[in-house]
Amino acid sequence: YARKSFFKYVDAENVFEVTKQGFAYFEKTFGLAYPFGKYDQIAVAEYNWGAMENVGCVTFHEDVLIFRSKVTERNYVSRATTIHHEMAHMWFGDLVTMKWWEDLWLNESFAEWASYQSVSESTKYKEAWTEFNSLRKNWAYRVDQLTTTHPIATEMEDLDAVRTNFDGISYAKGASVLQQLVAHVGRDNFIKGLRLYFAKHAYGNTTLKDLIDQLEAASGRDLTPWVSTWLRTAGVNTLRPVIAVDGDSYKSISIKQEAPTMPVGSKELRPHRLHVGLFDIQGEKLSRRTSVELDIAGALTEVTALAGQKVADLVLINDKDQTYAKLRFDDRSIATMKSHLGKLDDSLARGLIWASLWDSCRDGELSTSDYVAIALNALKTESDISIVAATYLQFETAIWAYANPAKRDALRTQVADATAAALANAAPGSDHQMQFARAFANNAITPAHLEKLKEILNGSEKGLVIDAEIRWYIFI
């Protein structure tokens, strides 16, 4: 449903396709048919939320559900995950509802996780987890390093406290930690536990213990230590490689784990089940040679399975993105990233590296100038539009919040010049062409840039649709 004046913009075919795919996925995965009879989706004018999971009637902000100008695939992925997020709430939140707000994560973290899982497995948007990593997980990292950080499962004294916890921790960190829980107990056991949970508590109210009891029953594992360290403590750990080389082979590779910087004084070192990947330059591409899975704990864990392996061009901790931690790299890997990041042939692995570059800049370990230079070079060959869009958002923050004010104009010029070149080389009518045009408009600063904007408005870029959206970018 939408306003009559918006009917011409409604992409009913895509919305209904994604909706049907979500229903089929959730009913099969959760082992329980949709419980509420009807299911309506309404685009609401000037809505004060992105969307809301009312039983049988989901309400969306118009701009979430309806596109009035041409958009990139990233917007379609975002819409699909929002549709599936609200649909997942029919089970997580409506069929089974938290008893009190300290278990907000039973609603939001699960809906966030379920939406990206379902979109990546049931729709054509197979790289949805890359979008999560590029945009949502970065949100979690930022919020989790502020003085206002809090545990995923945290006490809520009143409704004012509740309002402050609808944040990147309750949504994106929670979803990422659920990925770690899936790795910890195994996917089949995790899904079995969810089915037991829904069957036992349908139309009831629950606490964290109710869910954990069913996951323990399904997996045969005591999850008390896991809950204590992952759900009851705040902050994000950092994982670094410690590498010893013997000739052209690894004598040893170990993973050093550092405690969170926030909360101040935290000494929390968590257990992680993760993969470590080795990647090699093969012609123009950077490809995965091998990836080993292991459990790490404490300050230092050796990856014994990689001892004796030939030295790789890139070592990636948390390959396949099963855990929640900031990542760092050895010198050889950094050199490889500078030359071949955009040529790495796995989008999720690239997303992990892009995220690490960004939080290295945010943490002051990588200068703004170096971040911009590395990123602009990699963007030349970056194929995932979610990564491209996220990087340009991060350029804005880096230049306006982190850079030396005396260097801002030079950095904006550098970004605009590189983006103009990328725009000239982009395929006509492509998502990249549209994203580069918008980014160029945001960073244009010199007289030559302004002349280029006039040319764009007059149709100089073949295939670029000059609609209201791109005009706003140019004029504002």
Stretches with model-predicted labels:
Residues 1-258, 262-265, 397-398, 413-414, ...:
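Hydrophobic alpha-helical and helix-loop surface patches within well-folded domains
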